From Swiss-Prot:
Name listed for the protein in its UniProt record: Peptide methionine sulfoxide reductase MsrA
Record flagged with keyword Oxidoreductase: yes
Pfam families named among the record's database cross-references: PMSR (PF01625)
EC number, as in UniProt: 1.8.4.11
HAMAP family: MsrA
Keyword set, alphabetical order: Oxidoreductase
UniProt-annotated catalytic positions: 10
Reaction equations catalysed: L-methionyl-[protein] + [thioredoxin]-disulfide + H2O = L-methionyl-(S)-S-oxide-[protein] + [thioredoxin]-dithiol; [thioredoxin]-disulfide + L-methionine + H2O = L-methionine (S)-S-oxide + [thioredoxin]-dithiol
Residues making up the signal peptide according to the UniProt record: none
Annotated family: Belongs to the MsrA Met sulfoxide reductase family.
Summary of the function given for this chain in its UniProt record: Has an important function as a repair enzyme for proteins that have been inactivated by oxidation. Catalyzes the reversible oxidation-reduction of methionine sulfoxide in proteins to methionine.
EC class: oxidoreductase
């Protein structure tokens, strides 16, 4: 089993798509690489802790590669907007790949180098990860009728999986 950490805006959207990908074993929404220990969602929303909203992806490398995960990651968010995805604004929503080894770092950098010059995605060593509160886990599946899920997450799922 391997692990990847991606920040591409609100973790609810990122989680919802990766939940539907073959080879994914477990997903955990959380916060990483900030300047405080054990942050809460309220802390993150203030935008002063330095943490990013991330999804920790545990995957079977025999069924899906890190490179394929990178391909999906870059398809499901806008890597050219600094600290913003749609209406979500702030450093917690930055586009970032938090690598755990040199191979992941090199694959991420190589992929970005093949893309346009406008990519703002950070490639940063993972320093720390804190799981988000329980109500953030499996958010879309647990809250299908909520307006955010219907207006933002559902269309992203439909768009990605209709390709």
């Amino acid at each position: 089993m391997q692990t990847a950490y991606f920040s591409g805006g609100c973790f609810w959207c990122v989680e919802a798509i990766f939940q539907r990908i073959v080879g994914i074993i477990k997903l955990t929404s959380g916060y990483c690489n900030g300047n405080t220990s054990n942050p809460t969602y309220q802390d993150i929303c203030l935008g002063v802790t330095g943490h990013a909203e991330v999804v920790k992806i545990e995957f079977d490398e025999f069924k899906i590669s890190f490179k394929v995960l990178l391909d999906i990651f870059f398809e499901i968010h806008n890597p050219t907007t600094l600290n913003q995805q749609g209406n979500d604004r702030g450093t917690q929503y930055r586009s970032a790949i938090f690598y755990i080894n040199n191979k992941q770092q090199l694959q991420a950098i190589n992929m970005i180098n093949l893309m346009s010059d406008n990519i703002v995605t950070q490639v940063t060593k993972l320093d720390c990860f804190y799981p988000a509160e329980d109500y953030h886990q499996n958010y879309f599946n647990n809250n299908l009728s909520k307006p955010y899920c219907q207006m933002l997450i559902r269309p992203k799922l439909d768009k990605y999986f209709s390709q």
